Each structure stands twice: as structure tokens, then as C-alpha cells.
């Protein structure tokens, strides 16, 4: 146990006027540290020890020797990093983080708490006296105009999309984000667009009328220049060889959502696993890169498949918490990869002399998703397609799977149908779906694709061998995680969208459709894929798919009219034909879809895709870390916040911010989440399917307890047009600090009057290093994914 301080709290701390032996010794490894303002100063061990000693005196815990012991532990960790990583440069904030860590590890709880509170107060003091540069103020003021009355949107934008500018030690503003996207667009297209067209596209994005791929919005610049995969939203693949698992990992690490098939038709193509022969390959040193992690997985799988074994050396992998400079986020350290390799080894060796089962392939891929979430990507999105008669996959989330197989939570599961099921077959699946409580498995109807796809794509599928003589699509054709884009195995979905507003007219929607199609057509030219196999390039070039979506449909009465939907669809198709010719590429085989738009809807204040808003007036709550500089700035400017449920106001590690929101459409035609029955939701989905999408409208149907039988009857009657559908039990459960809470008009107006006018330019005074989390956005986020 820690010692109790044996001196008065008022003891005067003195420091030596000369440099100590410890400082001289440690400077051989760590000559300098970086201050908050970017200045480099000589490393000083005594300053660290003295700071810890002052904290111990204040909390009456420990003595000078204890303080020096903790300081040696802190600096010892820095020394290990300095040996492992060339040009390692500690920062003041990083050193203070280590001090907190080792105070806690040594059980100096009171000292650690006092030290954390002291740091927070000092940060507030620095922020209150910090000057925001005039040009930053001006940029922030100009950008704020585009978020007029949308404090939630500006917050989500800064949190999810604003990149760090190292030279100015701050996050970019909305105008700078749009210009970074436009600069990358010019870099790739050159004079294939006129200045007038570039201006039209830029203005449409700035005014939040249309959006490109939000992945490309995040990563335009160095990251997308290095590998275009990070600019795409989602993918689909049906693994048939060990390398395919590594490609899934690579794409997930790039931030792409991954749809995958574990049907018998592809899993049975994986090789037979040889029995272990006792041979062990030399230890493999894992390179500290996405490619290095993926190579390690491929090597492990191939080795275990061949009856041999191998060990891995993780010493090159950067420590947990290190910044990921190109993609953003923080490194996880080696533990997630170590866990994945151990899991994959166990699964492969358990099947010696046989092949992997479909559930084994599913679990390994889910474990990849879990590894990637831990390894720097904020969230991953996956969908697993399986055979209708695969009982193990049907029951994959039965009971308390989150206790025994928690990795399975990262993927939604859907059953594949190639013909219309009998009543008995569908009811078996339906009962399992109802009992699961999580709406699984969903439906992926491969058998309807030949009827619902555009003729040009049906012809392409015939030539590619996907369409049988009976007119049914077969083979590895699937979908992205939210089911709005129909994909071949090893193909990307390419999204852009129209944001429909309450005041839109037919003319304004058609102009937005034109701009969104230009964006999608441009994005389809980005095929520098790097690590993954050439099949991905071949499939993308052959089809040049677009996914022009309409979000905010329940904000805009005009956008919900069938004849307007058809005109918007036709405008997008015609625009794609014209600009594909100009860009020297093929026309897209399919153009229109509806994506859920979870994060986009929060950022740009619109209803999510095909779904209505929560209520006419509601509170939107957002979780955020207590250590996040963005939270501290919001708190200090008076934004309402509460500790997470079960945590105290003083000791919380997560806080909940509250934003009042008003829906724009309060006409008689307006509908909200609880206004639509399951059948009404399905009928509206059908309207969009038949009048707008060449792919599929993504939706999750909320079903009341007494609606399940009526819903399954509707599904049977409309089987020929169903592509992909998901269902969830409608929940009326109310719990504290829920993401959404309906309120009255009076409460909304009262909350709005009290809500501060947040000056986001002040973030520069709080954020001394890159804290942006660029891997948060998943364009296919829907349902529970909207809980940000």
C-alpha cells in the first residue's frame, strides 16, 4: 500500500540548481520533449519527479522517494519507446498521461485523482487566456453560416470529419474540409470538368445540398492518394482462399464496411486443413503497418492449413495510444492482433483433416472485425450472408451469445434466398427472427435480382455467368452491410447523396441529383487499390457502380412523390452517362440506392435516409469521453451535459451532451417514427424500390408485437421485389439518457433559449495535439449505429 505523507502539505518544494545525474543519464535516450506550443526543450527528470511529489503532498500520500520511483517508471516507459521507435519525441501531454497511469498502477488513488483534476483546471485556465488567431476566427465564422441553427451538426462535423492541420495545430473548418475534397477532385479530374462545374459542385456541398462519399470527404489528400480504398464506403466478398481473410482485414482497417458470404458454395472452396506434423517455421516479425498485420494473418492461416506452426514477434508494433498520422485515431498496440492470431489458430487446428465449417469462417471474420475495432477503427460494420438451411448460422446469436461469442456482435446476419420459400421454410426462419430479439437473420433475396435490377446489369450478369437459364441470379452476388448496394464478390459500393429539404421543389431536387451523380461518377474513377487482389479493380472497372441516394425523405413532401422519384432517378442515370463519356469510362451498371445515412443525418440536420425522424421535437444525446478536448470546450461554454448512467459527475469517464432538435416539416403530411405501422413502412419502402432505386432501399422495419404475422404475409405477397430487408422489434422502453427523447414544443423552445451559441474556434485553445477520430464515420450506419 502507498505510504502516508510524513510532511506538512505546506512543505516548500525545492529543486536543485544543477542538472541531476538522473536527468543527464536519461537525456542520452530522450534528449528533448515537445511543449504544448510546439517548442522543443531539454528533457528534465527532476521536473517530472517534483510534479509528482507536489501532487503527493497535496493528497497526503507517499513521500519524495515514492515520487521519484513513479517518475523512474514513467521515464523508463519513455526510454523503451525511444529504443523501439526512431525519432521518438515525447510530448508534455503524453508524459502527463503516463504519470496518471503509473500513479494508478501504484495505488496512489487520491494522488492520481488530484493530479487529473489539477491538469483539467490548468487546461481550463490556459484555454480562458488563449488567443484564437484572427484567421481561425474568420474561418470558423464563415463556416458557421452553413450550420445555421444546427449546433448538433457542427459538433458532429468537428468530431467526425474535420482533419487535423499539423502546421497550425488545429482541426480544419467546414470550408477547409470541402476545399480539401475539391482539391483532390481537381487533382484527379483536371480539366475534365469546367470551372463552372467545379464551382457548382463545391457550392452544393458547402450548402449541404448534396454529399459525396463521406469516407472520401474524410480522407481526400494523403490517405486517399496513398490508397483509394479508404474513399469507399463498403465492400462485399465471398472468401475462397486464406488471402481473402487478410483482404477483409485490410479493407476494415481502411475503414470500409464489409459484407461477406459464408455460404457453402464459397466456404467449401477453402482448402482442406492438413494435420499438424510438428514442423515449426521461423518466428515472423510483424511489420507495424496495415499490410504487416494482414500479411501476418495470411502467413498464419497458410501455415496452419499446411500442418505446420509458427510464432509471431510483435516488438515492432507501436504502443497503445500512439497517433495514427495518416488515417487518424490511435494505435491499439499489439494485443488485438495477438488475440486474432490465437483465435484463428485455434479454429483452424480444431478442424485438422477437414475443412472449416461456415460458422468457423464467420467467426474468424467477426474476430477480424473485433480486432480492427480495437486496432484504431472507431466502429466496424459487417453483414454475413449464409445459406437458408444453415442451422448453425441461424442460431449464431441465440441466447447469451454476447457472453460466449462476443465477437459475433460485429456482424448482422442475413439468410440468402434463391427461390421463394415455402410457408413452412419462411415461418421457421421467421420464428427464429422473432425470438432472437435482434431481428436476425434478415432477408437477402438473390432470386429477385433479375427482376429488380436494370436491364443493362441483367445483360452484364448473363455475360459474366451469374444468370442461369431459369432467369435466377446465382453465384457470389451479395450486398454491402446495410443492403442498399448489390455487389459481386470483391467489389466496392460508391455512395453520394441528395439531401432533401422541406422547401425543395422538383427543380431543386433534379439539380441536386445532377450534382450527386457527377460526384459518384468521379468517385468511380478512383481505382488505385494497392494491397488487395486485381479482382477488385477488374470488377469495379467493369461495372463502375454508383449509389446516388436521397436522404431526408421524410423532411420533404416533394421527395416522397413517386413521379418525382422517377425523375430524380432518370436525371442521375442521364448525368452518369454524360459524365462517364467525358471521363473516359463505362456507364454505371446501376446508379440509384437509398442508404441509411446515420451520421450524415446528424451532421446536416435531415431525416435518416428512408426513415422518419424520431418526433416533431426531441433531444438528441451524444456520448463523449471525459478527456476529449471537444467535450471540455462544450462544457466550458455551457452546453448541457450529464455523467453516463451509473457514473458520478466528478468521476465519470464518459459524459452525455444534450442538443434540442426540431423537425422541419410540421405539415399534415409529416410522419414520425411512431406514426408508421410496420405495413406502412413496408409500403413506403416498396414505393421507393419501384420508383427510385436500381439497387435497393436500405431499411430496418420496426415491428410491434402484434404485427409479425401481418408482416410475414406482406413479405410473401411481395417476394418478387424484395432484395434485402431487416426487421427489429419496436421498442417502447424508456431509459435514462437515451440517444433520442421526444419533448414538447414548449420544452424545445425553453431548451433552445438556454442553449449557448458555441464558438467552435475556441477548440484550438484546448486541443494541443491531434485528437480527431477520422475512422468514426460509416456511411452505411443505421439503426443502433446511430447511437454515437
At which residue positions do the language-model features occur?
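Extended catalytic cores of very large enzyme megasubunits
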Residues: 1-788
